[in-house]
C-alpha cells in the first residue's frame, strides 16, 4: 500500500474508529476511508504522502478550501476526511466530522487571524447561539456582512404558499424560513409570491397600520449629531426607507440594538394570520365527526382548525378538552366517556381505534345477523310450564297424560282407589273453607291431614237432634193415617164387630188420644 499504510498507525487507528461520520449517527470512520481519500488526492495533483503529517494535511486543506462551496459531494467528503486526519495528527479529541472541522477552523484563525481560508459553510455567524451558517447576516473577519437568501429558500417559500394556499401551515413555515432575516430579505420573500395578490394586499395594509403605531409609540428625538446612527422609523423597519447596512447596524450595534428583522417578521405574521382566517372560514365549533369517519381523521381536522384559531392558549386548551369529545359521533362519544375525566389524546386515539372503519362495520353486521337469525325467545312462564310438565298416568316428566303410551290407570289418579275421581278425592288437602263440592282446591291456608288412629278434638253429636228426628218420623206416620179414606175406616169398624182384629194397633190409635200425643203423655 505504500504511503497509505503509513498514514495512521497504532493508537491513531483506534481513535479514528471512534469518530462518527455525522453528529449522532451510527456509522464511524474505518481504514477504507483513508484509502479512499488517498486515491482522491491524485485527482487534484496532490501526493498521498501529505496525509502522513499535520503540515501536509494543512496544505491539502488550503488547496481544497476555495473549491468546497461549489464543489461536488466527493470533494466535500475528501475535505472532511482530511480535517479528521489533521485532528488525529494534532492529537485533538473529536467525536464527529463537524467537531473536527470546527477545531481546524479555530486553529487556522489563531494562526492567520482570518477565516478567509475556511469554507463558507463552516464560518462562524454573528448572531447569538442557535443560528447556522445559512443566515443572511454573517460575521467575517470581525465584520458583519449580508449574504443574500439562497434560491432554494425562496423556492421553498413560494412552493409552500402555492400548495397550502394560506392554510394554517403557512405561518410556522414563514417563521422557519425567515429566521434571522433582515427586512430586505423578508421583502424579497413577499415579492416572490406571484398569485394571491389579495392576501398580499391585506399584509401590506397590516404593515402600514403597525408602522403607524410604531411611529406613535417611538417619536423622533431631537436633532442628532453628525455621524450618529438615526433611530429606525416604521418605514425603516418595513425596509422601504432604509438600506441593508443600516438594518444590520440597528440589529447588531453594541448599545441599544433594535431587532428590526424580528419586528418586521411579527408584523407579517399578524397579516398572515388574518389571511389564514380569510382562506379558511371553517369555525372550530363546526368541526364534527361524521357517522362513518375514523376518529383519527376527525382529530386531524379538529387540530387543523384549532391551529388557525388565533386565541389564548387557555381557550385552546378548553376547546380541546370540551369540543373534541362533544363533537364526536355517538359511537366514539360512548367510548370516550368511559375513559373517565381528562383522558390524554393518546388514550382517546387508542380507545377509538377501529371505530367507523371496516372492522367495526363487519362486527355490527355480524351482530345484526345474529339477532335476526336467533329464535324467538320463549316467555318465562311458558318455559317453566314446559320444563315442569308431568304425566298423571305414569308419573313421569316430559309428556302429558294424553300423550302417555302406558295403560290407562283406573280410579282416582291421586289415591289409586276406585269409585271417585281425583277432583272428589277425600284424601286431598282441605283449605280454609274445607273440601266443598266445587271442583277446585282452595289455595290459601293449606291444612295438614290428620293421621289415622287419632281421636278428633271436636265435641260429640247432640242427643236432642236424634229425639227431634224421631218425633218428626212419628208425626209423618200419623198424618198418613189421618189421610186414609172413609171406606177403609168403616171396614175396620165392621171387622171389630165381627170379632176380627186385622188392624188392632191402628184402631187403638184412632180410639185413644195417643193419636194426638205421644206415649209420654
From Swiss-Prot:
A motif (PTAP/PSAP motif) lies at residues 456-459. Residues 73-77 are annotated as: Interaction with membrane phosphatidylinositol 4,5-bisphosphate. Residues 279-365 are annotated as: Dimerization/Multimerization of capsid protein p24. Gag-Pol polyprotein: Specific enzymatic cleavages by the viral protease yield mature proteins. Capsid protein p24 is phosphorylated possibly by host MAPK1; this phosphorylation is necessary for Pin1-mediated virion uncoating. The modification Phosphoserine is found at residue 150. InterPro entries: Gag_p24_C, Lentvrl_matrix_N, Matrix_HIV/RSV_N, Primate_lentivir_Gag_pol-like, Retrov_capsid_C, Retrov_capsid_N, Retrovr_matrix, Znf_CCHC. This is Gag polyprotein. It comes from Human immunodeficiency virus type 2 subtype A (isolate KR). The gene is gag.
Amino acid at each position: 500500500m505504500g504511503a497509505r499504510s503509513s498514514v495512521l498507525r497504532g493508537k491513531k487507528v483506534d481513535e479514528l474508529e471512534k469518530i462518527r461520520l455525522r453528529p449522532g449517527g451510527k456509522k464511524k470512520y474505518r481504514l477504507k476511508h483513508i484509502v479512499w481519500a488517498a486515491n482522491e488526492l491524485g485527482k487534484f495533483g496532490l501526493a498521498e504522502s501529505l496525509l502522513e503529517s499535520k503540515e501536509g494535511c494543512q496544505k491539502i486543506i488550503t488547496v481544497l478550501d476555495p473549491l468546497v462551496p461549489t464543489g461536488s459531494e466527493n470533494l466535500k467528503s475528501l475535505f472532511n476526511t482530511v480535517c479528521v486526519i489533521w485532528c488525529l495528527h494534532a492529537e485533538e479529541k473529536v467525536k464527529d466530522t463537524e467537531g473536527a472541522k470546527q477545531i481546524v477552523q479555530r486553529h487556522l484563525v489563531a494562526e492567520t487571524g482570518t477565516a478567509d481560508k475556511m469554507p463558507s459553510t463552516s464560518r462562524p455567524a454573528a448572531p447569538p447561539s442557535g443560528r447556522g451558517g445559512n443566515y443572511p447576516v454573517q460575521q467575517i473577519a470581525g465584520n458583519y456582512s449580508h449574504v443574500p437568501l439562497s434560491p432554494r429558500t425562496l423556492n421553498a417559500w413560494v412552493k409552500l404558499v402555492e400548495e397550502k394556499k394560506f392554510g394554517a401551515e403557512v405561518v410556522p413555515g414563514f417563521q422557519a424560513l425567515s429566521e434571522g432575516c433582515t427586512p430586505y430579505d423578508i421583502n424579497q420573500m413577499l415579492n416572490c409570491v406571484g398569485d394571491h395578490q389579495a392576501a398580499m394586499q391585506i399584509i401590506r395594509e397590516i404593515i402600514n397600520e403597525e408602522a403607524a403605531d410604531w411611529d406613535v409609540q417611538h417619536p423622533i428625538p431631537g436633532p442628532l449629531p453628525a455621524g450618529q446612527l438615526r433611530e429606525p422609523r416604521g418605514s425603516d423597519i418595513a425596509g422601504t426607507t432604509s438600506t441593508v447596512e443600516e438594518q444590520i447596524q440597528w440589529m447588531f450595534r453594541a448599545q441599544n440594538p433594535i431587532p428590526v428583522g424580528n419586528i418586521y417578521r411579527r408584523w407579517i405574521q399578524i397579516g398572515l394570520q388574518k389571511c389564514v382566517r380569510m382562506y379558511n372560514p371553517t369555525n372550530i365549533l363546526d368541526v364534527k365527526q361524521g357517522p362513518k369517519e375514523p376518529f383519527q381523521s376527525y382529530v386531524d381536522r379538529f387540530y387543523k382548525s384549532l391551529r388557525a384559531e388565533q386565541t389564548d392558549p387557555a381557550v385552546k386548551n378548553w376547546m380541546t378538552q370540551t369540543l373534541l369529545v362533544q363533537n364526536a359521533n355517538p359511537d366514539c362519544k360512548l367510548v370516550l366517556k368511559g375513559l373517565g375525566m381528562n383522558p390524554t389524546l393518546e388514550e382517546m386515539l387508542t380507545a377509538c381505534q377501529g371505530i367507523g372503519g371496516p372492522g367495526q362495520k363487519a362486527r355490527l353486521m355480524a351482530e345484526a345477523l345474529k339477532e335476526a337469525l336467533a329464535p324467538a325467545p320463549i316467555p318465562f312462564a311458558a318455559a317453566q310450564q314446559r320444563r315442569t310438565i308431568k304425566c298423571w298416568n305414569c308419573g313421569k316428566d316430559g309428556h302429558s297424560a294424553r300423550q302417555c303410551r302406558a295403560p290407562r290407570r283406573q280410579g282416582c289418579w291421586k289415591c289409586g282407589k276406585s269409585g271417585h275421581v281425583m277432583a272428589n278425592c277425600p284424601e286431598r288437602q282441605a283449605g280454609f273453607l274445607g273440601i266443598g263440592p266445587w271442583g277446585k282446591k282452595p289455595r290459601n291456608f293449606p291444612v295438614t291431614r290428620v293421621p289415622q288412629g287419632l281421636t278428633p278434638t271436636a265435641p260429640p253429636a247432640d242427643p236432642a237432634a236424634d229425639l227431634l228426628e224421631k218425633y218428626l218420623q212419628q208425626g209423618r206416620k200419623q198424618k198418613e193415617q189421618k189421610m186414609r179414606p172413609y171406606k177403609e175406616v168403616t171396614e175396620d169398624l165392621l171387622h171389630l164387630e165381627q170379632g176380627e182384629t186385622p188392624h188392632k194397633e191402628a184402631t187403638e190409635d184412632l180410639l185413644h188420644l195417643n193419636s194426638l200425643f205421644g206415649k209420654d203423655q
